[in-house]
Amino acid sequence: MKKLFAALALAAVVAPVWAATQTVTLSVPGMTCASCPITVKHALSKVEGVSKTDVSFDKRQAVVTFDDAKTNVQKLTKATEDAGYPSSLKR
């Protein structure tokens, strides 16, 4: 039992080391006016773990920097979809 507790405690301490900041580009083709990026940026900024967003109307994309221990691409695309702007990972 003590070994199990020690292993769990070690994992809890080391886990944050595995987390990394990631930057992804999302394609957001539904942005049709100059004010759409404001809504998309607001939706993405509310996602826990997002540290930076750069939304471009001209390119119809959002560049998002986030902590992958707190969120993931699926949560980002869900946030834009819930705001009325479906998005997908741009490759």
From Swiss-Prot:
Chain's role: Involved in mercury resistance. Acts as a mercury scavenger that specifically binds to a mercuric ion in the periplasm and probably passes it to the cytoplasmic mercuric reductase MerA via the mercuric transport protein MerT.
HMA domain: residues covered: 22-88
Gene from which this protein is expressed: merP
PANTHER family xref list: P-TYPE CATION-TRANSPORTING ATPASE (PTHR46594:SF4)
Signal peptide bounds: 1-19
Gene3D superfamilies from the UniProt entry: 3.30.70.100
Name the record gives this protein: Mercuric transport protein periplasmic component
Residues the entry annotates as binding Hg(2+): 33, 36
Keywords for this protein: Mercuric resistance, Mercury, Metal-binding, Periplasm, Plasmid, Signal
GO CC, any one term: periplasmic space
